[in-house]
Amino acid sequence: MKKYLFLDRGLMNPRQMSNAKLNLEKIRKDKTVFFKEDYFSEPSRKWEVRYDNGYPNVIYDREEKIYRCYYTLFIYDSDSAGTPLEKRGEKKYTPGPERITGLCYACSKDGIHWEKPELGIVEFEGNRKNNILFSYVHGTGVFLDEEEKDPDKRYKLVTKVDYAPGCGLRKWTGRQPQADTHNFVFRDHRTGRFVLITRIWRNGQRIAAKCESSDFINWSDPVEIFRGRGFEDQIYSMPVFVYNGIYMGIPSVYHEGDVTEENYDTVDLRLAYSVNLDNWEEAVIGENFIERGSGNYPEGEFDCGCIYAAAPVPEGKRLYFYYMGGNGRHTGFRETSFSRGCLEKDCFVYYGQKNKAQEAVLTTNPFFFYGKNLSVLVRAGEESSVAVEVLDNEGCVHIKGKPGQRTENETEGGSAEWRKVVWEEGFGN
């Protein structure tokens, strides 16, 4: 079945629409913390001193039947280590030059109960009993390349590493990307090439950029693909996934530019889309895909300050979005936790009425459908109705129909359902 998502504005004919407003469907949060920073826990994981943004990469490995999470963190941070939780509300966070980043790993059999296994790979304070995969790396992106034929290369990784050889004789002449972001990497389904979504700076603003590679070793220079609106809405990071042939992005949007604003120095999660990877726009301008929790640091909810998400994991009729939520402002003290929310498949945006007392009219550009079958994804209230008309190029109505009867599962604010259009007599009934 060919689907057309209202998310794609190219589907619509704006010259023949009225009283219609595009709305963003919100992700329903679990509100359950699956795991968190364990520096102050008992027993303590001393290397989990500050997750900061976390930049989670969540993968369900269908062959191994396991969920994997790869997340960035600070394994050394003197100010976080030296300031007890109860004292942080009284003190300004001061990051020092000695901070060291790393990459850690967690896993789960069901996506709900997570463990941090002792990997025995990286030495930390005299032993290897930890879940650290790498130290001195930042903003790591990990993906499972299901088209890779070599089983040892199925999991691929891109990261930022600062390295000095120590001799003082070798000058690095290669690229030096800023890349202090979630360096999100995937294989483009259209071209087979690898794509890296990273970040650059232009005119003092954070901007999403794209690099490409055919071999995962040699990469093109970063090219701007998406910027926000001034200082107030900057693209901090943007994981990308493909849905129904459309590129979807979940940008974390950083707010600065006005210290008097309530959202100053916080990070919201938005939804963006593109049909070609080069030109992006927000699905619904200024609306958050995952709402931050209520309150402020240190008493607020665990995700009241900053949100950074992973590309979704599909399961049944839903998409699950795992994310790192911080309870403080971006540059301040904050404790970060790992959680998730879900969205019904196909339900990214929906049209409703601007004026509830009047009907809304949506008109598409011409498209083909074969046979007599046409279905509409509907979530309508008790007092609502939907009608369908087929027009010619002059806008004259030729055929009328209505979606079939609503079921008990379809409720206002509940599940949406695909309803087959029942045409008027004489057309395929």
Question: What is each of the regions a protein language model found here?
Answer:
Residues 1-429:
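Carbohydrate-active catalytic/glycan-binding domains of CAZyme proteins
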